[in-house]
Structure formats: structure tokens, C-alpha cells
């Protein structure tokens, strides 16, 4: 007998937690069930050590504003990402202020920096600063080529550096480090207190649609072969990170045809030595290598995890065919179907430089990887750093009318035409934009409910519907409010 519920959220990460809280705030009477394949929430991509913890607000990430063919830098994409992060930040602040999260320990003030180290990159960074400084959301950004000034911002990165090497940096004091694992756990704890049912160690075996439009999920208990659970729901969200593609394919919705995925794994060096970690207080992003994917931009970060400060450097791209860190090596081959084979072949052929780059990364020894760290931290001691494996990211491959198939970086909502099912595919900027992504998903799937939600949404997100960059006075009010509540 199927257990009926209004909403099923598949995946125990930041996306399901965010959508769950939004729905509980907007539709308190709806019954919600969250199912997770592992024994707890936030053990895959949302776990603190499976992502970089950057509150992506485009202050330091150079790939969000590349140099155009005309020599001009357009800040539009960077502004869009910054606006989205501020929506998330407002939502988190409201939940803290209303006592719905335990505290604000999941977010810490950590300055964001960009550091570049050759003449061309220094010229680019100057142009980027010139394009950004006139924008409200970037007005506090600083730029310098003065080595002493840069040393004040990031002493470890300048100590022992060649005096003749050109360097330039920008600095934004309002950057953040976010423990998305802790945030997810706090959100789910709140949901459980509101009656949301959580089912752990549940693997989705099958997804079918019944004649009345309801979705039926057959799940198995990963610890007990006889522990079957069947759920029946009118709305299904597939937010299982890299596993969402496989679930989307199981659903059989026409909107999911032609989608494929390319998994990329990440490695980081981590330093937990207190005396070293205390000397660096910034997330410092550089320029990606030629041919490198956007998620491979090198950065030396301050991380605050479970009340302790660490340093982390990376990522180093790798390849494993599983879609989740605790997934199966058969994930990629089993995801290839007749409807996505051609798009995947076309995307693969068009991205040979990426394939070459990944092969080169895979062949690197630990010493060769450490040499990259020395470019950013010249006096780094190899004995103080351990190499850790972060989470899997599945990049989207989709059909394209002109190219056959394209590899797409970013996130994408794929929803059934009637709004009864939605999946979130892709990666960066991911968790930082969870709130605007889930609000957009809700409007797409429940258009008839949206008007009745406006009032509460404006309480949850005080600047809802407003572009902060275009409303300076309101931006000052909201940014000051969220900074005070979140202690950032």
C-alpha cells in the first residue's frame, strides 16, 4: 500500500532542505516527506568538505566576468550571481531572526580576493575593477598592485614571492565562508519539528506516474532487503545532486529526454595546522589554466568548519564515472541512452581540450599538484597539507539544435509541463543560489499558487522582487540588516 503525501523531496542536501522550508512557510498544511539514500542529510555535495564553502557573490570569481573579444568586461553575469546570493542571504537572515535556525554559525565573514601573477592578468584585473567599481554591489571592492598592500590582505601569499613577479589583487571585506552542511542540518531539524517526515537509507528503485497524475516512488531500504516503502505524491522534487539525472531518466518525462551528464571530481589540499591557518583570512581566487573548466579555478581559502579554522587549496580536477561520491562507477555508462547518446558524443567532440586537460590532471603526482599550491603560497610546507577528495559534480550535457549537443556549466531546472515533477541538474554556483533557484522552481511548478505567496515571500526575503544593484538606498538597508543578523 502506497503512503500518500503532498510533496516528496528526493535528496538530503541544501536544495531539498531549502525547498522544504520554503514550502512549509508558504503552505504549512502540506505534508512533506524527504528521502535520502545515506544515513543522514548533507553527506554528499552539501557536506562542508565536499564543496569550497564560498558564498558565491562574484566578488572574487574571475570566470564570471571574462574579457570580451572587444576588450570590454561586462559585469552583467557577475551582478546576476551577486543578486542571487543576496536573496539567499536575506532568507537565511530571516530564518535566524525568527528563531527557525539554531544560530548563525553556518556563515562567517571571510574577505574575498582575486590574485593574479602576470602582466596580462594584471591588466585584466585592472579592467575588471574599473568595470565593477561603479556597481552598487561591488562599490566597496579595492584594487592594488602594491606588494605591501597585498601583503596586508594575504601575508602568506606574498611571503617568499619573487620580487620581480608582477602581481595585482582585488579585495572585498564583505565576502563569506558558508558551511552548507551545517545550514542543511539546521534547516532539516526545523522541518522535522514542523512534522516533515525524513526517511534515511532509502534508495529510489522506480518512479511511475498513475492515471490520476500522482507520482509513485518505490524505494528500498539499503540496510534491509525487505524494507520496501512506496510513496504516492502529487509533487516530486529530484534534488539528489549528481544523482538527479538518473532519477530524472527513471521518471520518463519528455522534458528530460536528451539530457546527459559528465562527472568531474575534485581534489583539495587541506591544512589544519592552527598557527598556519590563523595567518590567512581570505578566500583568494586566481585565473584558471587554459582549457580548464570553470570549476577548476585555483583558490586558497580560509574554511571555518565545526568551529575550527582550516586552509584549503584547489581544486584539482579528476575523473570518476560515478555521479555521487558514494555512488557507483556504473552511473555514467548506465545513464547513456538512445536519446542522449548523440548529444553526448557531439559535446565530447567539441570539448576535446577539456578531455585533454582532465587527462593531464589525472596523470599529475602529488608533488606536481603541490607545485601549483606553491604558486599561491610560496613557503608552503608539504608536511602540513593532506590531499582530500571533495564531492562529485555532474556537468549538464543537453541537446542543441545547431551543435547536436553542448556541455553546459551551471544549474538548470528541468520540470514536467504540468509542474508535478522538477529536477535540478548541474553544479556551480549551486548552493549559494539555492534560495532564488527554489523560488523560481516553485513559481514554475505552482503558478496558480504564486500570487498568494507574495506577502510571506516578502517577509522571508525583504528585497524580494527588487534588484539591489539598482536600488542603492534599499540595498544599504538590506545588506546592513543581514550583516547584523548573520554577524558578518
Swiss-Prot record:
Cross-referenced InterPro entries: FAD/NAD-bd_sf (IPR036188), MQO (IPR006231)
Record keywords, A-Z: FAD, Flavoprotein, Oxidoreductase, Tricarboxylic acid cycle
Cofactor(s) needed by this chain: FAD
Enzyme superclass (EC): oxidoreductase
EC number: 1.1.5.4
Organism domain of life: Bacteria
Enzymatic reactions: (S)-malate + a quinone = a quinol + oxaloacetate
Example GO BP: tricarboxylic acid cycle
Stated family: Belongs to the MQO family.
Protein name per UniProt: Probable malate:quinone oxidoreductase
Amino acid at each position: 500500500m502506497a503512503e500518500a503525501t503532498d510533496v516528496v523531496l528526493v535528496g538530503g542536501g541544501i536544495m531539498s532542505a531549502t525547498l522544504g522550508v520554503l514550502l512549509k512557510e508558504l503552505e504549512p498544511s502540506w505534508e512533506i516527506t524527504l528521502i535520502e539514500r545515506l544515513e543522514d542529510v548533507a553527506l554528499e555535495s552539501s557536506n562542508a568538505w565536499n564543496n569550497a564553502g564560498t558564498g558565491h557573490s562574484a566578488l572574487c570569481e574571475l570566470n564570471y566576468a571574462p574579457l570580451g573579444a572587444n576588450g570590454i568586461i561586462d559585469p552583467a553575469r557577475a551582478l546576476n550571481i551577486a543578486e542571487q546570493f543576496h536573496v539567499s542571504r536575506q532568507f537565511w537572515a530571516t530564518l535566524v531572526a525568527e528563531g527557525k535556525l539554531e544560530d548563525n554559525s553556518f556563515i562567517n565573514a571571510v574577505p574575498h580576493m582575486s590574485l593574479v601573477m602576470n602582466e596580462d592578468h594584471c591588466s585584466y584585473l585592472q579592467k575588471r575593477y574599473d568595470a565593477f567599481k561603479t556597481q552598487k554591489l561591488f562599490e566597496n571592492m579595492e584594487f592594488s598592485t602594491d606588494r605591501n598592500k597585498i601583503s596586508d590582505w594575504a601575508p602568506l601569499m606574498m611571503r617568499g614571492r619573487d620580487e620581480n613577479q608582477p602581481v595585482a589583487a582585488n579585495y572585498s571585506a564583505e565576502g563569506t565562508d558558508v558551511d552548507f552542511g551545517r545550514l542543511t542540518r539546521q534547516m532539516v531539524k526545523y522541518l522535522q519539528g514542523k512534522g516533515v517526515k525524513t526517511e534515511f537509507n532509502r534508495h529510489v528503485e522506480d518512479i511511475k506516474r498513475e492515471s490520476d497524475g500522482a507520482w509513485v516512488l518505490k524505494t528500498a531500504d539499503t540496510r534491509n532487503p525487505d524494507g520496501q516503502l512506496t510513496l504516492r505524491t502529487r509533487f516530486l522534487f529530484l534534488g539528489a545532486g549528481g544523482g538527479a539525472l538518473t532519477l530524472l531518466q527513471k521518471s520518463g518525462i519528455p522534458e528530460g529526454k536528451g539530457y546527459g551528464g559528465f562527472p568531474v571530481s575534485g581534489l583539495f589540499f587541506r591544512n589544519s595546522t592552527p598557527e598556519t591557518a590563523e595567518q590567512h583570512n581570505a578566500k583568494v581566487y586566481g585565473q584558471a589554466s587554459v582549457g580548464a573548466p570553470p570549476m577548476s579555478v585555483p583558490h586558497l581559502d580560509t574554511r571555518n568548519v565545526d568551529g575550527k579554522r582550516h586552509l584549503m587549496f584547489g581544486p584539482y580536477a579528476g575523473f570518476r564515472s560515478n555521479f555521487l561520491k558514494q555512488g557507483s562507477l556504473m552511473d555514467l555508462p548506465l545513464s547513456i541512452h538512445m536519446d542522449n547518446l548523440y548529444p553526448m558524443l557531439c559535446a565530447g567532440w567539441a570539448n576535446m581540450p577539456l578531455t585533454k586537460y582532465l587527462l593531464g590532471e589525472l596523470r599529475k603526482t602529488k608533488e606536481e599538484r603541490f607545485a601549483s599550491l606553491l604558486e599561491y603560497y610560496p613557503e608552503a610546507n608539504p608536511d602540513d597539507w593532506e590531499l582530500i577528495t571533495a564531492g562529485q559534480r555532474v556537468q549538464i550535457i543537453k541537446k542543441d539544435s545547431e551543435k547536436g549537443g553542448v556541455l553546459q556549466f551551471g544549474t538548470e531546472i528541468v520540470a514536467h509541463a504540468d509542474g508535478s515533477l522538477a529536477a535540478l541538474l548541474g553544479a556551480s554556483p549551486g548552493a549559494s543560489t539555492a534560495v532564488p533557484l527554489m523560488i523560481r522552481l516553485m513559481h514554475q511548478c505552482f503558478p496558480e499558487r504564486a500570487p498568494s505567496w507574495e506577502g510571506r515571500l516578502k517577509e522571508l526575503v525583504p528585497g524580494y522582487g527588487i534588484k539591489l544593484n539598482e536600488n542603492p538606498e534599499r540595498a544599504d538597508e538590506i545588506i546592513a540588516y543581514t550583516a547584523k543578523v548573520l554577524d558578518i
